[in-house]
């Protein structure tokens, strides 16, 4: 509940910028209605709204959609509120009354949003309060905006490391001015840490580490024409100020300079096989989605099985995919015929039970299952009994069991975490790196209004022995956290530690 209160407090503190910092207005506005938290009560207050350069009505001239009406916006807010209240599996951690209070406080600010993007950002903040990576609000509209691409040929990819926002990739033609590894010091005169905190408010994630990880890429997002004055500190200690202007759409695969070994193609590779001395196979598993990655793994497995004496499975940045794919790959590295991805439960509701529990109090539920069922259903607290999620495999299948290290980081999430749950019971497997994202899966998807939909997490997953990881992440057996100095030197200390560990096996 403390995390829920913290989420409310943060949202309440910064939602005074409900006009949404860094976006364009279709209509001029001098004030915006914001929110303020006093105790458990959300109240309104007005704040001055500064205008920004380069954000006029012309931005929307090529927008191909009819803007959402105030009525549609309020309906979308209400639809998301009600479906989350009914389906979100961790609503008991949030508190239904607080969720209701926040919803009521947002009705007027939502109605007054001045354009579609401003409304979308406010919906993102509402969603982020639930603190779950598989609970989201998304749009199908081509907003005239960008996050990494800017005028005059600028492309910047930002990441967080050592608590700082750093340039991971930059357009090669601009690399002499802002080299990879340069730190963002300020944006429009505001400290980078403050700007990052604002971006984090719109990020749906299970903990602060994951929010920070995802928010870096959103730091400079803005509608076309939005100007940013960004101060960078180069790796050599010198400083430079750059004027960046958002464009409409991203440039895609441009010619980029990156930190050594951290180009996006390598980091996002769905599959890669490399060999290290001593017949140590390094296998990059960047995704568990069906398709080319699975085929590449199957094509390479005979070589791995025939040669590898030790194994490194790199799941860093693996955002998941299908649980069945994760289990299928795990089956190649285990002799077990039964693989368990943990136990899961979901929200349940019986209207008749709720009617019987309307007058019940907590003390009445002690040693009284029928009353307890009524009490929980009336208050939206009823959950299904935990069920194991298991996969069975033939005992005579092709598999390879050798000393194995699995590399993880905060980008390891969803079915990649289910893979780690299965690995937890394998004595030959060890986790090295940093804690994972801490999110589960199975979002139920609803259309809110034409052009906007949401997903709401419906399953809570735990280890078979009932250990929790949702919200905190799965900790490694051996923690190794890279530093900016490592990246600048082209070192991968996590991989280095894995090789050291396997050398003794």
PLM regions with names:
Residues 9-20:
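Bacterial N-terminal signal peptides
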Residues 277, 335-396:
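A substrate-binding/cap region within the structured catalytic cores of diverse enzymes
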Residues 25-311, 315-345, 353-362, 403, ...:
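Flexible, low-complexity junctional segments that flank or bridge functional domains
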Residues 1-11:
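Bacterial N-terminal signal peptides that target proteins for export
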Residues 392-407:
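Short, conserved helix/loop micro-motifs enriched in His/Cys and acidic residues
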Residues 472-484:
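Short helix/strand-capping connector loops at secondary-structure junctions
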Residues 368, 372, 378-387, 395, ...:
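Cysteine-dependent hydrolase recognition
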């Amino acid at each position: 509940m403390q995390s829920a209160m913290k989420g409310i407090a943060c949202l309440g503190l910064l939602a005074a910028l409900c006009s949404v910092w860094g976006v364009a207005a279709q209509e001029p506005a001098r004030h915006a209605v914001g929110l303020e938290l006093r105790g458990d009560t959300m109240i309104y207050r007005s704040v001055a709204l500064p205008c920004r350069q380069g954000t006029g009505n012309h931005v929307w001239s090529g927008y191909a959609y009819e803007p959402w009406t105030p009525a549609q916006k309020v309906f979308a807010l209400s639809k998301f509120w009600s479906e989350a209240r009914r389906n979100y599996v961790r609503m008991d951690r949030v508190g239904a009354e607080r969720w209701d209070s926040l919803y009521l406080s947002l009705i007027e600010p939502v109605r007054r949003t001045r354009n579609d993007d401003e409304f979308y950002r406010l919906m993102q903040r509402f969603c982020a309060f639930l603190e779950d990576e598989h609970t989201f609000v998304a749009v199908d509209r081509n907003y005239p905006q960008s996050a990494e691409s800017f005028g005059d040929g600028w492309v910047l990819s930002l990441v967080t490391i050592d608590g700082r926002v750093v340039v991971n990739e930059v357009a090669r033609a601009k690399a002499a001015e802002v080299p990879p590894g340069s730190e963002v010091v300020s944006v429009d005169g505001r400290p980078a840490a403050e700007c990052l905190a604002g971006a984090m408010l719109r990020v749906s994630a299970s903990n602060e580490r994951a929010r920070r990880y995802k928010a870096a890429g959103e730091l400079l997002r803005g509608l076309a024409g939005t100007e940013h004055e960004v101060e960078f500190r180069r790796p050599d200690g010198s400083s430079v100020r750059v004027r960046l202007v958002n464009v409409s759409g991203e440039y895609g695969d441009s010619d980029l300079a990156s930190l050594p070994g951290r180009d996006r193609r390598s980091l996002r590779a769905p599959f890669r096989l490399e060999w290290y001395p001593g017949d140590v196979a390094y296998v990059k598993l960047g995704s568990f989605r069906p398709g080319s990655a699975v085929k590449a793994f199957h094509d390479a497995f005979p070589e791995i099985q025939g040669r590898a004496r030790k194994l490194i499975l790199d799941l860093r940045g693996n955002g998941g995919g299908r649980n069945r794919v994760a289990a299928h790959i795990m089956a190649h590295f285990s002799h077990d015929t039964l693989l368990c991805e943990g136990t899961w439960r979901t929200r349940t509701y019986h209207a008749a039970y709720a009617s019987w529990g309307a007058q019940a109090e907590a003390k009445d539920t002690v040693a009284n299952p029928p009353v307890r069922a009524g009490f929980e259903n009336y208050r939206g607290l009823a959950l299904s009994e935990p069920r194991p999620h298991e996969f069975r495999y033939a005992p005579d299948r092709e598999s390879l069991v050798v000393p194995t290290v699995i590399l993880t980081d905060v980008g390891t999430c969803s079915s990649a975490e289910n893979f780690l749950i299965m690995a937890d019971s394998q004595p030959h497997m060890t986790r090295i790196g940093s804690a994972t994202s801490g999110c589960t899966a199975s979002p139920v998807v609803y259309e809110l209004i034409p052009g906007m939909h949401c997903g709401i997490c419906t399953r809570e997953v735990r280890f078979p022995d009932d250990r929790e990881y949702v919200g905190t992440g799965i900790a490694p057996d051996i923690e190794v956290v890279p530093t900016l100095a490592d990246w600048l030197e082209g070192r991968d200390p996590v991989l280095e530690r894995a090789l050291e560990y396997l050398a003794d096996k």
